[in-house]
Amino acid sequence: MSDGPPTVSRDEAKKLIAEGAQLVDVRAEHEWEMGRISGASHLPLAELAERAGEIDKGRPVVLYCRGGNRSTMAAEALAAEGFDARKLSEGIVGWAEEGLPLEPEGGSVAESGEAASILHAQKRLPPS
């Protein structure tokens, strides 16, 4: 019985990335647009099955979402396919709370619903 995918701290993630690990954001598009960890690639959880081939199986991958649920699912799915997949502890929220850099400069980590509302207001997303 598994306890879930390995979890890495922010410091461990920074070290892994410096050593060549891939950083993948599995949040939705509107969350990605609000702010993301510098250097991350975007692969929403909903598209993981179709796009997993975009991830290099020969390098570790650190996945993150807002707080950990989606990155847990993504890491478990990738690990089942033979990837060295880990999830970032506390997600992008923990990253931002520590004052670590986000893109674009001044990016934010709003609540999921709040992010969508802000983007609707800014007319970046069509109204639903």
Residue ranges and their predicted role:
Residues 63-65:
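Short, surface-exposed ligand- or partner-binding patches at beta-edge/loop junctions that are enriched
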